[in-house]
Design a protein with these regions (language model features):
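Short, small-residue-biased leader/transition segments that mark boundaries at the very start
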Residues: 2-7
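Conserved SAM-binding loop
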Residues: 14-15
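C-terminal helix-rich "cap/oligomerization" subdomain common to oxidoreductases
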Residues: 18-20, 44-49, 245-289
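Short acidic low-complexity segments
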Residues: 27-41
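Rossmann-like NAD(P)-binding element
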Residues: 37-57
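Beta-strand-loop-alpha-helix segment that lines the small-molecule cofactor/substrate pocket
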Residues: 44, 55-102
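Rossmann-like dinucleotide-binding domain that binds NAD(P)(H)
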Residues: 124-198, 258-261
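NAD(P)-dinucleotide binding in Rossmann-like oxidoreductases
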Residues: 169-174, 182-246, 250-258
Length: 289
């Protein structure tokens, strides 16, 4: 296994974290800073950078290394043209690619999915305080699309508060307000992010006769009034299982790049329009990650 990072301090921290865990004597891990130090062929690469450098890293990687499978972190890219450029690059190099929106892997969302009548519209709402609307909406859109059984959506950004906020990640921005999502079968998703710490995390899903409430921070859901615990897996508990699935079967349950790319582009176009109106400038990129 190899771990690459341009910042030596981050590599040292990663090594420390790895060695604090239960080390597998059958594994060898390398800590690298340059793509040129990688082997010429790799079975699986996870690109877990922020959004701005991701396409450049992807291009540099595929120019030097034959990669069979890649997992990309969201938010994928900051510019709309990046998505088609990346798609062409991935197709030319015959790479299997997925995007890490891991709620699809949570057992309780799989259970909810089995309850949903896909012939009826789904009504989903998510409200919380300062949860990173720009950064994290794609997670909610992704699980909404899985549950609704839809592949395309439109979105209305009229409810965004026209004030640019600094993201907790340096060099990136955020907005508060609401985004409303609509699919062809009439399913809707309302995403609300407020600057009010008294507002409690709330996710609701209504479909047919089912009324479901999910509270991820407190670890429970209520299905038609019946409350039950849910297990929120950490990323560290998920990555190994996903990697095994990809390496053994050549596939996994994460969203493919080509599907997630479409979800990203609709959201990015909408939030970029808001960003340009608020700043009074014509940016071709919106710095969200």
């Amino acid at each position: 296994r190899g771990l690459g990072d341009v910042y030596k301090r981050q590599l040292q921290i990663a090594q420390q974290r790895y060695e604090e865990g239960e080390v597998n004597s059958n594994q060898t891990i390398y800590y690298l800073q340059l793509i040129e130090q990688l082997p010429t062929e790799l079975d699986l690469v996870v690109i877990a950078t922020s959004s701005k450098p991701r396409l450049t890293i992807l291009k540099s990687l595929l120019a030097k290394v034959k990669v069979t499978n890649i997992i990309l972190e969201k938010f994928l890219f900051t510019g709309l043209t990046d998505y088609d450029e990346a798609e062409q690059l991935l197709q030319i190099n015959h790479v299997n690619v997925w995007v890490n929106c891991p709620r699809r892997l949570f057992d309780f969302y799989v259970e909810i999915d089995s309850m949903i009548d896909k012939q009826k519209p789904l009504v989903m709402e998510y409200t919380d305080s300062n949860w990173g609307l720009c950064c994290n909406s794609i997670h909610m859109i992704d699980i909404f699309m899985m549950l609704s059984g839809e592949k395309t959506y439109t979105a209305c950004f009229d409810g965004i508060i026209p004030q640019v906020k600094d993201s907790k990640r340096n060099g990136y921005i955020e907005f508060n307000g609401t985004v409303n999502v609509l699919t062809p079968n009439g399913s809707t998703l309302r995403l609300a992010c407020v600057d009010d710490d008294t507002v409690q995390h709330q996710m609701t899903i209504i479909n047919g006769s089912h009324h479901i409430i999910i509270n991820e921070p407190e670890g429970f859901m209520s299905v038609d009034g019946n409350k039950q615990p849910v297990h929120i897996k950490y990323q560290s508990q998920l990555t190994g299982a996903v990697a095994d699935e990809i390496l053994l079967n050549g596939n996994c349950k994460l969203t493919t790049y080509f599907e997630s790319s479409n979800y990203h582009k609709v959201f990015l176009k909408g939030i970029l329009d808001v960003y340009n109106k608020v700043t009074g400038e014509m940016h071709d990129r919106c710095p969200i990650t």
